Amino acid sequence: MPFGRNAVIRLEHGGVNESTQHYETVTYWYGLPAASLVRTDELSIGDAASERSHQYVSPGASPPYEIASRYEWGPDTLQGKEIYPAASDRGRTTRTASEFTLKIDPKNWGVMLRRKLDYAFPNQRAEVWVGAAQPPGRSREPQWKPAGVWYLAGSNTCVFSSPRDELGAALQVVETSGRRFRDDEFLIPRELTAGRSAIRIRVKFVPVEIPLYPGYPLPDLAWSEMRYTAYSYVMPRFKLR
């Protein structure tokens, strides 16, 4: 579990965190007194200035849209009190490809790319390609190298199959939660990032045409992008006393 100066760990007691019984937990941390993963850049999709400074290009992308939602953290309300209020954010969807440039540490040992997304679009899959960053205004195509496939299964919609009788026919009940925000991460190997102060990233959408269950209409498929954050793996720097 990578983290910076601190980590917030939430434990849910009971189905909706309603249990008031005594509970204790102990956490052990094994690490070094210096960071080995540092944030080096962030692209906010839907923000014109951020898209421009990161040379964001996505010809088939939707216009920016705003949603008010939550992460999968816990109950919205408990005993009439709102625990996790909804927040608003902007993003786009694409059914083609997106390209952008992110700064990284030249002495990196690899890069972790984190994406904030709209989880209402199921089974998001894309090919990831990495190339050398180009100066602004230069249109030469990078020499792309494959970094792998980025896949996030599922969505905020699920199906419960509860037959009325023990041997009865399946009864599909489809439910959609209000948690549309989600973070997902993709690791870029060092051979594609070492010695570079910035990288050009290409994400090409590959649809997964699988219905929620046989006979259910195929949902709207797209690659969602709200924010891309680059974290560089670095050698920890510290002095022994």
What are these regions (language model features)?
Residues 1, 81-112, 116-240:
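Beta-strand-rich ligand-recognition modules
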Residues 1-54:
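Charged, alpha-helix-forming regions
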Residues 37-79:
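Extracellular carbohydrate-recognition regions
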